[in-house]
């Protein structure tokens, strides 16, 4: 996890340097920006690969080490993660399209500004929950279920603290807008509450999805992510068109769709840990 963070830092640093070169030396264009992004990504990936394999020779791929016995199980697991990620991309990218189509493009700015404030909490959560994926995997192989249970409890406590921060953010949101964009013209209390609930559901779910990913248990996530994707669009359209929620209906539609996993996951996780601890 530390190496991945180091790699991401190098990528961001290289992008800043290349953007400065583009601003002061080259004529700015979308094509130029795309080329810089491609070059930066390519160079950093080459450097990261050489750096990693030079320090860890046993990580170098070899045909001799391929185990075709594991091919089917690895392909099944990889396909599950792929479908989960595709579902997430569809789920998280359709909201603005729905707003533009149902309410008009001028309403997108309300949603985008509000979401950018609250989505910061998922970034904060990512700092401590990201490394837990590999840690859960290691502890699962060691059969250290006490550590896993204690860690998930700590993660949930941190999530509760983030909920408190979200409540504070709701109460001062108009001041945040004034500081950020210079006015509070895009203040919409109903939308603020809806997005706060939507982000809260995501924070709660991330605790359990990270654990289940670490245990390579993707069955529940695959089913619920597909169900959420299929439910989200028609539900959001219904809430916008046939209720008085307006733009907030988009966020509520996403929150309700994600709640399928958020409700089932704690019980499923408890069942798995209880079963494994008695083996």
Report each predicted region and the residues it spans.
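Membrane-interface junctions at transmembrane-helix termini in multi-pass inner-membrane proteins
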Residues: 1-8, 197-227
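Membrane-interface helix-loop junctions in multi-pass transport and translocation proteins
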Residues: 1, 13-46, 219, 229-263, ...
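Interfacial segments at transmembrane-helix termini and the short loops linking adjacent helices
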Residues: 105-107, 145-146, 172-200, 248
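Helix-loop junctions and terminal segments of transmembrane helices
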Residues: 57, 118-142, 211-214
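Interfacial/gating helices of multi-pass transporter permease domains
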Residues: 30-34, 69-77, 81, 99-119, ...
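Interhelical loop/hinge segments that connect adjacent transmembrane helices in multipass membrane
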Residues: 26, 30-37, 48-92, 143-146, ...
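Helix-terminus/linker motif at the lipid-water interface of multi-pass membrane proteins
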Residues: 21-26, 86-120, 138, 177-182
């Amino acid at each position: 996890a530390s190496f991945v963070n180091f790699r991401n830092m190098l990528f961001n640093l290289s992008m800043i340097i290349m953007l400065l070169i583009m601003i002061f030396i080259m004529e700015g264009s979308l094509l130029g920006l795309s080329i810089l992004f491609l070059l930066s990504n390519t160079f950093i990936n080459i450097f990261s690969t050489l750096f990693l394999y030079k320090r860890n020779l046993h990580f170098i791929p070899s045909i001799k080490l391929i185990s075709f016995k594991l091919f089917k199980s690895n392909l099944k697991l990889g396909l599950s993660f792929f479908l989960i990620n595709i579902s997430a991309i569809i789920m998280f990218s359709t909201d603005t399209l729905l707003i533009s189509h149902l309410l008009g493009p001028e309403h997108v700015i309300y949603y985008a500004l509000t979401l950018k404030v609250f989505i910061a909490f998922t970034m904060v959560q990512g700092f401590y929950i990201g490394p837990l994926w590999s840690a859960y995997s290691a502890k699962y192989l060691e059969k250290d279920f006490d550590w896993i249970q204690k860690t998930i409890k700590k993660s949930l406590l941190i999530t509760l603290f983030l909920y408190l921060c979200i409540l504070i953010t709701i109460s001062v949101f108009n001041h945040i807008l004034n500081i950020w964009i210079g006015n509070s013209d895009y203040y919409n209390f109903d939308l603020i509450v809806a997005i706060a609930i939507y982000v809260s559901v995501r924070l709660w779910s991330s605790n359990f999805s990270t654990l289940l990913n670490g245990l390579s248990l993707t069955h529940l996530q695959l089913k619920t992510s597909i169900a959420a994707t299929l439910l989200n669009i028609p539900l959001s359209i219904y809430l916008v068109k046939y209720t008085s929620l307006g733009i907030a209906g988009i966020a509520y539609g996403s929150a309700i769709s994600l709640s399928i996993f958020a409700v089932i996951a704690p019980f499923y996780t408890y069942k798995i840990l209880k079963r494994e601890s008695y083996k």
